[in-house]
Amino acid sequence: MPDDLINSFMTGPDENGRFGDFGGRFVSETLMPLILELERQYEFAKTDQAFWDEMHHLWTHYVGRPSPLYFAERLTERLGGAKVYLKRDELNHTGAHKINNVLGQIILARRMGKTRIIAETGAGQHGVATATVCAKFGLKCVVYMGAHDVERQAPNVFRMKLLGAEVVPVTSGRGTLKDAMNDALRDWVTNVRETFYCIGTVAGPHPYPAMVRDFQAIIGQEAREQMMEAEGRLPDTLIAAIGGGSNAMGLFYPFLDDKEVAIIGVEAGGKGVNEKMEHCASLTGGRPGVLHGNRTYLLQDDDGQILEGFSISAGLDYPGIGPEHAWLHDIGRAKYVSITDAEALDAFQLCCETEGIIPALEPSHALAHVAKIAPDLPRDHIICMNMCGRGDKDIFTVAKALGQDMSGAV
């Protein structure tokens, strides 16, 4: 890591929404006034104690925060090395970390007088969280979801509809998260007056990457306090799965200036990081480009055309990554690795068998890397992994991958 870096890794983005060479605002002229107004409103809300009082009240009484920091004793014994702690964000209302951010954005939308909320979703968890909070506040909700993801995440589609949301299947491209985000942006341009776009990850044009990070940072803030209480010191290693990267950024951000804490993000390796791009590991196998309003690492061909990635995990099936992650990668503050579908499935089963926790396929990727490195680490080494979602939504996908019959026969 260069010696001449700024004293803090937590000062970004700059006034142009940049994290080094990444981020920014690459949007149409139609959207620019909306983006600038959103930035103004968020900058004001950030300094308004009443805004954060409402956030913390709802995090506590509606979401169920703080989420526990859990010592995975049997998993630690099975792996035979480092102590493994799980930050249990799958216990949040709606079953994932997504609601942490959704609450903040929708409180902001209400302050701005917006009556219609749109969102994109991959695994469906951001869509469910958005539909949930819209129902609580009586707002119209439209969720764009790739047609392929609608098929493989049917339980979450039904949940969104139960909550009153309109779910719009997106058939363009491969029908995944990238395509859903494209259509959501088109909707926003068309319905600028009454509509607020609630982005679910630390991507998109500024101020979204920083705003989503700030709302998700409650994960890492709690983990710091809980780890100090449990162990009397900070963890040695943080590990989290990365699609766009919001759960990881939420865990990592409060620890960025703790140089003794190693930070590892785990991308979706699909069938393996290869020239066929049968993966979604944009940092491992991509290069810089522009998508969805920000400059970051992307899966693309020689002509700069965005490629369709592949992952068994709908929530990680995105050909890019948040710009702050791209910056942390390039300056060496965080390390990024990839895990294949097969490795994630093994970790999914390991967690079920050892801890009685059914993880989502997204954190199963992080858990697979934990299982890979923990046995070779000393017993006093502490790993803190973000369990960012529960696996109810994935049981049909996992059953199919494992060749299990879900027809009801024992």
UniProtKB/Swiss-Prot annotation:
A Pfam family: PALP
Needed cofactors: pyridoxal 5'-phosphate
Keyword vocabulary terms for this entry: Amino-acid biosynthesis, Aromatic amino acid biosynthesis, Lyase, Pyridoxal phosphate, Tryptophan biosynthesis
Catalysis performed (reactions): (1S,2R)-1-C-(indol-3-yl)glycerol 3-phosphate + L-serine = D-glyceraldehyde 3-phosphate + L-tryptophan + H2O
Top-level lineage group: Bacteria
E.C. numbers: 4.2.1.20
Family: Belongs to the TrpB family.
Subunit structure: Tetramer of two alpha and two beta chains.
Listed name of the protein: Tryptophan synthase beta chain
Species in which this protein is naturally found: Dinoroseobacter shibae (strain DSM 16493 / NCIMB 14021 / DFL 12)
